[in-house]
A protein has these predicted regions:
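Sec-dependent N-terminal signal peptides
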Residues: 4-16
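Compositionally biased P/S/T/G-rich terminal and signal peptide-adjacent segments
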Residues: 60-86
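Hydrophobic alpha-helical context, especially transmembrane and signal-peptide helices
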Residues: 11, 21, 25-26, 80, ...
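Non-cytosolic coordination micro-motifs
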Residues: 21-60, 64, 89-181
Length: 181
């Protein structure tokens, strides 16, 4: 069943990638970078789904604001104190139990698909170590917007192993670089 879900996910998620010229044209669950969460949810629903202090002082993150058949999870990031709730990040993905190799296979399929459709986007380097629990492959356009496809693997807690696809505005991506360093 998990494989079927993944293939449905791949087809539905990436069918609009091939025709998109910019990241804001890619839709995930109908939402896209630059759109407003208020187009889909009430302010109360947004606040209820927002996790406190994930990215202090700058951005807020909603968790599973919408039930979805395609993904195991979905998060949407917007700027703190933005009354329009402009979307700066969307992440979604599928959980993998304890076989990281399966995650890597699916990651490679997605990378190949993006590489064929987004020829003008370059990949960013990542220092890959054999024992790493996080393996991202990131595509960036000339404007700084990014698509990341990442495998997360934690042998001690298989409930959080996942293949994650993230769309990020330049502003959010730059913030993450500063925040994580």
């Amino acid at each position: 069943m998990k494989k079927l879900s993944l293939y449905i996910f791949l087809v539905l998620m990436w069918c609009n990638v091939g025709s998109a010229k910019e990241i804001k044209e890619i839709e995930v669950e109908g939402m896209s970078i630059g759109g407003s969460l208020l187009e889909y949810f009430t302010e109360e629903e947004i606040k209820e789904a927002t996790a406190p202090e994930v990215y202090p002082d700058k951005f807020e993150v909603t968790y599973n604001i919408r039930e979805t058949l395609r993904f195991d999870f979905i998060t949407v990031t917007y700027k703190s104190n933005d009354k329009k709730y402009k979307i700066h990040g969307i992440s979604t993905g599928l959980k993998f139990s304890n076989n990281i190799q399966d995650c890597y296979k699916e990651q490679n399929k997605l990378v190949e698909e993006i590489s064929m459709n987004w020829k003008n986007w370059g990949t960013l380097p990542f220092d890959d170590e054999d024992n790493s629990t996080y393996k991202p492959i990131t595509f960036e356009d000339g404007k700084g917007d990014a698509i990341s496809i990442s495998c997360y693997y934690f042998p001690e807690d298989t409930s959080i192993n996942n293949l994650k696809i993230s769309l990020s505005s330049r502003e959010f991506k730059n913030y993450l670089k500063e925040y994580l360093n």
